[in-house]
C-alpha cells in the first residue's frame, strides 16, 4: 500500500514538474503574468501539501528498503526545489539555466524514486 500511494504521488509530482517547465518556458516567451492570490498561492499551497506527504512517504521508503541510489538528503532537496519550481514557473524571476537545473534535479530524483518502487514491487 505504501509503495502504491508513493508511486501515485511521485507520478503526480513528475507531471506537475513537467507542466511547470512548460509554463515557465511559455511565460518567459510571452511575458505572461499570473495573479498571485488567484493562481500562484493556491498552486503553491496545494503542491506544498503534496510535497510534504511525498517526502514523508519517500523517507519511509528509504528507512524500510535502504535503496542504493536514493538518499535522505535528495528527498529533502526535492521537496524544497519542487516548491521553488512551482513558484518560479508562474513568476519567471529566475534565470533560465537555474530553472532548468532545478527542474532536471527534481525530475532525476523523482524518477529514481519511481524506479526504486518499481524495482521493489517487481520482486
From Swiss-Prot:
Organism the protein comes from: Bacillus subtilis (strain 168)
Protein name per its UniProtKB record: Uncharacterized protein YppE
Gene that this sequence comes from: yppE
Amino acid at each position: 500500500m505504501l509503495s502504491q500511494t508513493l508511486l501515485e504521488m511521485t507520478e503526480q509530482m513528475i507531471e506537475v514538474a513537467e507542466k511547470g517547465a512548460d509554463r515557465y518556458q511559455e511565460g518567459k516567451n510571452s511575458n505572461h503574468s499570473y495573479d498571485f492570490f488567484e493562481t500562484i498561492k493556491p498552486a503553491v499551497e496545494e503542491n506544498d501539501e503534496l510535497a510534504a506527504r511525498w517526502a514523508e512517504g519517500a523517507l519511509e521508503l528509504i528507512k524500510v528498503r535502504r535503496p542504493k541510489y536514493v538518499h535522505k538528503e535528495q528527498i529533502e532537496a526535492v521537496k524544497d526545489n519542487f516548491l521553488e519550481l512551482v513558484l518560479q514557473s508562474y513568476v519567471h524571476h529566475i534565470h533560465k539555466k537555474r530553472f532548468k537545473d532545478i527542474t532536471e534535479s527534481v525530475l532525476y530524483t523523482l524518477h529514481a524514486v519511481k524506479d526504486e518502487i518499481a524495482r521493489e514491487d517487481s520482486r
